[in-house]
Swiss-Prot record:
The modification Isoleucine amide is found at residue 83. Expressed only in cerebral ganglion. Keywords: Amidation, Cleavage on pair of basic residues, Secreted, Signal. This is Cerebrin prohormone. It comes from the Eukaryota. May function as a hormone and may play a neuromodulatory role. Residues 1-27 form the signal peptide. It comes from Aplysia californica. The gene is CBPH. It is found in: Secreted.
Amino acid sequence: MFGYRSLLVLLVTLSLCLLLQSSHCSAVRTYGNDLDARARREIISLAARLIKLSMYGPEDDSFVKRNGGTADALYNLPDLEKIGKR
């Protein structure tokens, strides 16, 4: 009925389609966002503490204007206090 070659081509095509379908399903799978409100608040507060530590250091009264660890230096923001001064 079918020749050996056409049966082989049909099997290879079918296996390739199944392989592509299975890889497509696993790559597109969505993962649920399981962060509740408490975890989000904790992440935000920890990020705020990191920024505060980078700006002020361990003591609150020792403000360091610009060094390698301040947030504006990390994001490469310009020093706005030097603009306009001669």
